[in-house]
UniProtKB/Swiss-Prot annotation:
Keywords annotated in UniProt: Activator, Developmental protein, DNA-binding, Nucleus, Transcription, Transcription regulation
Residue ranges, annotated region (Disordered): 168-196, 220-258, 341-366
Chief subcellular location: nucleus
Sequence ranges of Basic and acidic residues compositional bias: 171-186
Keyword presence, DNA-binding: yes
Protein name according to UniProt: Forkhead box protein C2
SUPFAM superfamilies documented for this protein: Winged helix' DNA-binding domain
PANTHER family: FORKHEAD BOX PROTEIN, FORKHEAD BOX PROTEIN C1
Comp. bias intervals (Polar residues): 230-258, 351-366
Ranges annotated as spanning the membrane: none
Length: 464
């Protein structure tokens, strides 16, 4: 059997050992003659052929077995023990059964039994994947049975005993079981809290944030025939003052498109002297955030249409705390608005009242706007210029009023709103007191000719 493995194609080659070939080869004299020249030392070499064949016959069979079967198998002791246990009929085997299985399967372990059997015992006791099962039957024999832990069957990769994943430990198995249970529970119950609820929360947050902008624009878009929106504006805006002061600024242009054209068309039809102030800021109701809201967005929508008519100079519009409005052009005189709607209508010329007078106001509400703003005539298609970059006109000659820097940025406006809010909460001002802490100043680009007043509109500020 082993000679067939080592048969060679050319037995006459010099490097081939003769006894590795078939034995009948030595009886053939013709084939041996080719080796006569190198082996001329032996005159009668044919007489050695039968003797060589017989004398070395037993040795020939054992010699090729040494390099093949005496090589150590590439399996670990754990793999050898696992093979023995899995080949047992009951998946359990004694220590002697493990020894016998290894020696029958691998001839390498037929020698040096003391060394590798000691290693087998160490691996059985040190590895948790092998479980010792005591004998419970009355069968003859000694020694306990060894079996595999049920969780260690996947210890080797793809069933190959050459590669083991990692050292088996019961702690790792218990952790893996807990992880599997948690994962299984997470698959059943996990999608509801982990996936759907955050989406639902996100939807709720978006719905709670997005209506703020439409609510602000809806409150601030004052139509000439909608008085209820004016009454609701301080309450609805007061709930979100911080959002209104910041978010109302970018929305001034969309708001101006829906409101300013209608309002200007109404203002064109009415005479200049008969226009009464628009009720815009209810100051007595205590709704502080209504000041920045009404003057940042709605009033800018009215006046920004006329901003394109200004050439070089510009006016400044100041709303004081006690419902006093100052609109200046190039006149050195002090122009103040009447404090209430009744005074405005009584002090003005008796004529056809503007439709803006029909807006209903709550009790004690004061409005601050003079008719000079409504004398603007501008086309609705013109684009509203942003009022942040407008340099204010020279209005330092006006006494009794404090004016801020002529070029205002939005943080300064916010600081004025905060100081204005603090001024309202700290002390009640008298009617003639107007200071920088209780005023919000917003510059508007406008031509001086638009803000010029005729003599009947000049009111003395000391009157208030």
């Amino acid at each position: 059997m082993m000679q067939a493995r080592y048969s060679v194609a050319d037995p006459n080659a010099l490097g081939v050992v003769p006894y590795l070939s078939e034995q009948n080869y030595y009886r053939a004299a013709g084939t041996y003659g080719s080796m006569a020249t190198p082996m001329s030392v032996y005159p009668a070499h044919e007489q050695y052929t039968p003797g060589m064949a017989r004398s070395y016959g037993p040795y020939h069979h054992h010699q090729p077995a040494a390099p093949k079967d005496l090589v150590k198998p590439p399996y670990s002791y754990i793999a050898l023990i696992t093979m023995a246990i899995q080949n047992a009929p009951d998946k359990k085997i004694t220590l002697n059964g493990i020894y016998q299985f290894i020696m029958d399967r691998f001839p390498f372990y037929r020698e040096n039994k003391q060394g590798w059997q000691n290693s087998i015992r160490h691996n059985l006791s040190l590895n948790e994947c092998f479980v010792k099962v005591p004998r419970d039957d009355k069968k003859p024999g000694k020694g306990s049975y060894w079996t595999l832990d049920p969780d260690s069957y996947n210890m080797f990769e793809n069933g190959s005993f050459l590669r083991r994943r990692r050292r088996f430990k019961k702690k790792d198995v218990s952790r893996e079981k807990e992880d599997r249970i948690l994962k299984d529970q997470g698959k059943v119950q996990g999608p509801i809290p982990s996936l759907e609820l955050p989406k639902h929360d996100k939807k709720i947050v978006i719905k709670s944030e997005s209506p703020e902008l439409p609510v602000i624009t809806k409150v601030e878009n004052l139509s000439p025939d909608g008085g209820s929106a004016m009454q609701d504006s301080p309450r609805s805006v007061a709930s979100t003052p911080s959002v209104s002061t910041e978010n109302s600024i970018p929305d001034q242009h969309p708001a101006s498109n829906g409101f300013s054209v209608e309002n200007i068309m109404t203002l064109r039809t009415s005479p200049h002297g008969d226009l009464s102030p628009v009720p815009a800021v209810p100051c007595r109701t205590g709704m502080v955030p209504s000041l920045p809201i009404n003057y940042t967005q709605t009033q800018s929508s009215v006046y920004s249409q006329a901003c394109t008519q200004s050439m070089d100079t510009s006016g400044s519009y100041q709303c004081s705390m006690r419902a006093m409005s100052l609109y200046t052009g190039d006149r050195p005189s002090h122009m103040c608005a009447p404090s209430t709607l009744e005074e405005a209508t009584s002090d003005h010329h008796n004529g056809t009242a503007s439709p803006l007078n029909s807006m209903s106001l709550g009790s004690g509400q004061e409005s601050v706007l003079t008719s000079s703003h409504h004398q603007q005539t501008a086309t609705g298609g013109q684009t509203a210029a942003p009022w942040y970059l407008n340099p204010g006109a020279d209005i330092s000659h006006l006494s009794g009023h404090n004016f801020g820097s002529q070029q205002q940025t939005f943080p300064n406006v916010r600081e004025m709103f905060n100081s204005h809010r603090l001024g309202i909460e700290s002390s009640a001002l008298s009617e003639h007191q107007v200071s920088g802490n209780t005023s919000c100043q917003i510059p508007y680009r406008s031509a001086p000719s638009i803000y010029r007043h005729s003599s009947p509109y000049a009111y003395d500020c000391t009157k208030y």
